[in-house]
From Swiss-Prot:
Alphabetically ordered keywords of this record: Meiosis, Signal
Leader sequence segment: 1-21
Protein name in the entry: Nitrogen permease regulator 3
Record family assignment: Belongs to the NPR3 family.
GO CC annotation terms, alphabetical: GATOR1 complex
Compositional bias per record (Basic and acidic residues), positions renumbered to this chain: 116-142
Bias kind Basic residues: ranges: 249-266
Region (Disordered) residue spans: 29-64, 116-194, 246-283, 654-694
Source species of the chain: Debaryomyces hansenii (strain ATCC 36239 / CBS 767 / BCRC 21394 / JCM 1990 / NBRC 0083 / IGC 2968) (Yeast)
Extent of Low complexity compositional bias: 170-192
Main function: Mediates inactivation of the TORC1 complex in response to amino acid starvation. Required for meiotic nuclear division.
Any GO BP: meiotic cell cycle
Compositional bias annotation for Polar residues: 669-688
């Protein structure tokens, strides 16, 4: 597996509520959660492992699951092999599979294990004689009560269990099941709501009542992320609890803005802090409802791969669970939607109580209850990695886990990805908007696993996201399907504004150009859209996976065969489709050969035979970009400062410093010259380090030494050595080598004072730009950072290609250009 491949890992969804009657399971989907084959296989593996552990261990604490024990009094080898013989009787899908809660079952299995050991010892003495008496259910129940009330260290006296074969055990289970059924019938006659078949079955091997208690946390743990793992299953949700005043949203709560979250999933703000939307709820008498529901919890059951566990869990919580739960909380606060639906579900269960199967009950509930319907549709669509369009209180809401079909850099050769993925650096524009999910370039990124690869709601830099999102107006939209098919799939009206907008989208026109065209045609056809509406429609189409953001397709742009082209997977099939779609054009292999035939990439115009073929070639190019065969080649530039420029600027600074010193009174000589010499070289004092100054200072140092010591021999020799080193020509060479290389200005838009001097020197003396080009240079200077392509620069700054070509030719010796996707 890979993080680039969709893997929701969802097994089911539970709706649990807490009322005055306690925790209750309202609805589960799919209805046959107990029949999950993956869980059954995990339980079987756990059976064998736990059985072997019981055979070799004398510990009282056994790491076992609900179906670990099979009663048999044969030898150890026969006991280990008994799993296969008793699988049909011990079926986890049946009601009589469990004897009670999990703690009760563990206590019972402990007693059965003790009995098996004593039975084996007794068989050795008495010749393996067995009794035909049955296990008394009352004694088992008393054992359960004793195990609950007593301490774990206290020895519980074994009852008189003289038979442990499978037939007797099955009779015991059936008798207990009958007693449970009779107690249920008594409860229904006493006025307590009857337990429906959907709440009395086991869920993935666990008793429903046990799960309900576990999935209804205390109030202090609600309104924040809930996550618990049992065996290989993860129960994930966002429990919503009402406040003391009866409202479902704190009146004074707000979302504090914070910086980036710290490392680790445990420090994620969405996990530990209270999750609240930035919606101002009105605390009215209606919000302080008198219903008996104090909490509801929509729980997603997941079984992700171990190495992807953190990432898949965070992904599901971020994109689906948190957003869906908050929408339900909003509807509950405003209209009591959840509570009204739950009461309806209880009434529907009462009507359907005497019907045949659980599957029929689930279908009946999904047909009648909108809450059950949205839960079932959410599971169906999310498990298929589709978009879940849910109707919540007659309002359409969309939820999805974005598919990773956009890459800003080439993945490793061992990293799987979806065929037809798009490779372009322009995807970074929408990386922080949540509309797309950028693909991973390595198989398992440790940082992404720790943080989930996801930004929290509060972790997005708003300013950065807004500026990037605004740039979409300069891009074009490439529809990923036929316009009429998209209109039909999104269920838009044929003559609606959105439908007309979809029909007008062309990959050769930017959205800004489309907006200007609509303004001009508004007086004629009465159809107008401003830039804000166009951006909103574009974001919706991208989120619905109906469109892709690209730079407008042009014959003057350069296109190459994408390194991620699905040559080995879909090539033969796409050859037939391409020939059928564009019969007048060369075949798909020949078309790709035209784009990559030359050693140097060239413009698309050189490939088109004539103007009559222009539209056909542009349509074919759009088709190739849509299916990931072709990507555009972008040009990025940096501003380079040569060594010559830096030396000139340094000379100017030295001259300015010398002039400033002449204007000031001369400072007194420092007698501690030796301290300055030993302190190291100061680059700021290089202007004073000429040979005459060095000799003068050395003579002063000799005079000071003679006056102090009278024995100048050793000190004079040391001073002579220092003088030779300072006057040596190698010092000058070493000083030049420090600044011998060229410098690339990473961010010229935020250049320092020294870097601005370098840039001014390049423009004024080296390039001798005209006043017009100088003005244009400073307008485009911020884009010379290697992050913004020149193709986008032409669209944003309204610069003609001729002006840009003239400017780049004038500063050719002082720029570094790179071309990539």
């Amino acid at each position: 597996m890979s993080l680039n491949l969709p893997n929701p890992s969802i097994l089911g969804i539970l709706l649990v509520v807490s009322t005055h009657s306690g925790p209750q399971l309202v609805f589960q989907y799919p209805p046959d959660l107990s029949n999950d084959s993956k869980k059954s296989s995990n339980l079987k593996r756990t059976n064998k492992t736990s059985t072997l552990q019981r055979k070799d261990s004398d510990s009282d604490e056994l790491d076992i699951d609900d179906d670990d024990y099979i009663a048999d009094n044969e030898n150890d080898e026969e006991f280990v092999n008994a799993d296969n013989d008793e699988e049909k009787e011990w079926d986890s899908r049946k009601m009589n599979y469990y004897l009670g809660t999990k703690s009760d079952l563990l206590s019972f299995l402990d007693e059965q294990e003790k009995f098996r050991q004593t039975s084996q010892e007794r068989n050795k003495i008495y010749g393996h004689k067995q009794s035909d008496s049955h296990i008394d259910p009352d004694e088992i129940k008393s054992l359960h009560r004793n195990s609950k009330s007593g301490s774990s260290d206290k020895q519980i006296e074994s009852p008189k269990l003289e038979a442990s074969n499978s037939n007797n055990l099955k009779k015991t289970i059936s008798s207990i099941s009958d007693s449970q059924k009779s107690s249920t019938s008594k409860a229904s006659t006493s006025g307590i709501p009857p337990v429906s078949p959907i709440t009395s079955s086991t869920i993935l091997g666990f008793e429903a009542d046990y799960l309900c208690e576990m999935l209804c946390p205390p109030k202090q743990m609600c309104n924040s992320r809930f996550e618990i793992m049992i065996d290989d299953l993860v129960f994930l949700g966002l429990p919503i609890h009402s406040y003391d005043n009866g409202s479902w949203k704190s009146k004074h709560s707000h979302r504090p803005k914070s910086g980036k979250s710290s490392k680790g999933r445990s420090k994620n703000a969405a996990d530990n802090a209270s999750i609240d939307e930035g919606i101002d709820y009105e605390t009215t008498s209606k919000s302080q409802s008198k219903n008996s529901m104090s909490m509801f919890h929509l729980v997603f059951i997941m079984n992700p791969p171990i190495i992807e566990c953190n990432y898949r869990i965070d992904e599901m919580f971020h994109y689906v669970i948190s957003r869906l739960s908050l929408v339900l909380r909003y509807e509950q606060s405003k209209h009591e939607y959840v509570w009204n639906q739950i009461r309806m579900i209880y009434n529907l269960k009462e009507e359907f109580r005497n019907q045949a199967t659980m599957a029929n009950l689930t279908k009946y509930l999904t047909d009648k209850s909108s809450l059950c319907k949205l839960i079932s549709e959410c599971f169906t669509q999310i498990s298929r990695s589709n978009i879940a369009n849910l109707s919540i209180n007659n309002k359409l809401r969309s939820f999805q886990i974005p598919i990773k079909t956009e890459f800003h850099s080439l993945p490793d050769s061992t990293v799987p990805y979806l065929p037809g993925s798009h490779l372009s650096s322009t995807v970074n524009m929408l990386a922080n908007t949540g509309l797309i999910s950028v693909g991973e370039t390595i198989r398992y990124d440790v940082n992404n696993l720790n943080s989930g690869g996801l930004d929290d709601f509060d972790d997005i830099d708003d300013n950065k996201s807004d500026s990037n999102a605004d740039d979409i107006i300069y891009y074009a939209l490439l529809l990923l399907d036929d316009p009429e098919t998209i209109i039909r799939d999104i269920k838009a009206q044929q003559q609606s504004t959105l439908a007309n907008f979809i029909r007008m989208i062309k990959p050769t026109e930017s959205l800004l150009k489309l907006a200007n065209k609509l303004k001009q045609q508004a007086s004629d056809n009465g159809f107008s859209l401003d830039a804000g509406q166009i951006k909103s429609f574009a974001f919706h189409l991208i989120y619905w996976r109906r469109a892709r953001v690209i730079l407008p397709i042009s014959t003057r742009s350069v296109y190459i065969v994408s390194p991620m082209a699905p040559i080995t997977l879909k090539f033969h099939h796409d050859i037939f489709i391409f020939k059928k779609t564009f019969p007048a054009l060369p075949s798909l292999p020949h078309f790709l050969k035209l784009l990559s035939n030359s050693s140097k990439p060239r413009q698309l115009a050189t490939v088109i035979p004539s103007k009559d073929h222009r539209d056909a070639y542009l349509n074919a190019l759009s088709w190739l970009i849509r299916y990931g065969y072709v990507t555009q080649l972008h040009t990025f530039i940096w501003l380079k400062i040569s060594r010559k420029i830096k030396m000139k600027v340094e000379e100017d600074l030295e001259n300015e410093g010398a002039n400033n010193k002449r204007k000031k009174p001369s400072a007194t000589a420092d007698p501690n010259i030796s301290n300055k010499l030993n302190a190291g070289t100061d680059n700021t004092s290089k202007t004073e380090s000429n040979p005459e100054d060095i000799q003068r200072k050395m003579s002063q140092l000799r005079m000071i030494n003679r006056n102090n010591n009278g024995n100048p021999t050793s000190y004079e020799q040391e001073i002579d050595n220092i003088e030779k080193k300072l006057l040596s020509p190698s010092i000058g060479l070493n000083l030049v080598l420090e600044d011998e290389g060229d410098t690339i200005i990473i961010d010229p838009g935020r250049a320092s004072s020294l870097e601005r001097r370098w840039i001014n020197k390049v423009i004024s003396e080296e390039c001798n730009l005209s006043p017009e080009l100088t003005v244009k240079f400073y307008e485009l200077l911020k884009y010379m950072n290697g992050k913004n392509s020149l193709e986008l620069l032409l669209l944003k700054e309204n610069v003609s290609r001729q002006e840009l070509r003239t400017l780049l030719f004038a500063i050719e010796d002082h720029i570094i250009s790179v071309r990539h996707w």
